[in-house]
Amino acid sequence: MRHFVFVILCSCFLAACSTPMAPQDISTASARWASLVKQDANLYRIDDKLYRSEQPVAEDGELIEQLGIRSVINLRFFDRNDNETHLKGRNLMLLNRPLLTWKIKPKDVAQTLFLIEKQQKYGPVLVHCYHGADRTGLISGMY
């Protein structure tokens, strides 16, 4: 009898573990996350204080200022001076926080999040890498 009860309990447990979750409506999931601002710049608004994008180009400078962004944090390890090239003369704080894509440590993530929080005292922050995918996605997700 005890063996029978054990088998029934195990069967119920396994059935519960294998039951698929209800599909989530993609539109409501994305509405809770980031909202697209400019597709060709891979620019998204995470919240009132954080934006994410790929490497900004000169044409993005005006929009960045219109959004009230005050700080631009570059996560790129190579070609770190592109912000100065594309965004010079703008009323923006340009900061470098290089992350080596294949060697990011928890300490690097924590320091980057601290820098974002510190810069948000001056206004919204834009964080980016080259494509706005891996490094930017990691930092945005941890934020």
Regions found by a protein language model. Name each.
Residues 6-14:
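Hydrophobic helical h-region of N-terminal Sec-dependent signal peptides
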Residues 13, 17-126, 138-143:
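Cys-dependent protein tyrosine phosphatase-like superfamily
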